[in-house]
Design a protein with these regions (language model features):
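Feature responds to low-complexity, polar/acidic, surface-exposed segments characteristic
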Residues: 1-68, 72-105, 116-140, 149-157
Length: 157
């Protein structure tokens, strides 16, 4: 469903950051439990898991590349989750190196099962290929799945 040209199922950067940050909260009395969105964005930027563009434009629609970057950096910085040593399973993603800066973020999340790949049929043959689809916009449902997968990883470590 579209409202004035934008899909209402698409999640914004700010909404995603708010929901992801809930993974960090430890106690109901944690001062972070009362943080406003502008304060949260400033905090994330200061800590290094958000970029300037995320803080300045929280209403921007979230794409998969941005979600991977934010999620990876959040897990690394706020939850102290270390990188996997072997990310070779991610090399089957045909577009992994579309963004060389993002490649490790995407590979880490893909190998942990936090974000998935999409199968695409290049032609009528049966040789489907896996793609991350960097610039595809994320729906709220997909974002909630990513956050649930992060929660599972958090508890498994």
């Amino acid at each position: 469903m579209k409202v004035s040209g934008q899909d209402i199922r698409v999640i914004s950067v700010g909404e995603f950051v708010s929901q992801l940050f809930a993974l960090r909260k430890k106690e109901p009395t944690d001062p972070a439990a009362q943080i406003t969105l502008p304060e949260l964005l400033r905090f994330g930027h200061f800590r290094g898991w958000l970029e300037d563009a995320d803080e300045r434009n929280p209403t921007a629609p979230l794409n998969r590349q941005t979600a991977a970057r934010i999620t990876y950096e959040f897990l690394r910085i706020e939850l102290s989750i270390l990188d996997l040593v072997d990310i070779s399973p991610a090399t089957k993603l045909k577009d992994l190196y579309t963004c060389r800066v993002c490649a490790n973020h995407i590979a880490q999340l893909y190998c942990r099962g936090i974000m998935d790949a999409k199968k695409e049929e290049p032609d009528s043959t049966d040789s489907s290929q896996l793609f991350f689809n960097h610039l595809e916009l994320m729906t709220k449902e997909e974002a909630l799945t990513v956050i649930a997968n992060c929660e599972a990883v958090k508890h498994s470590i």
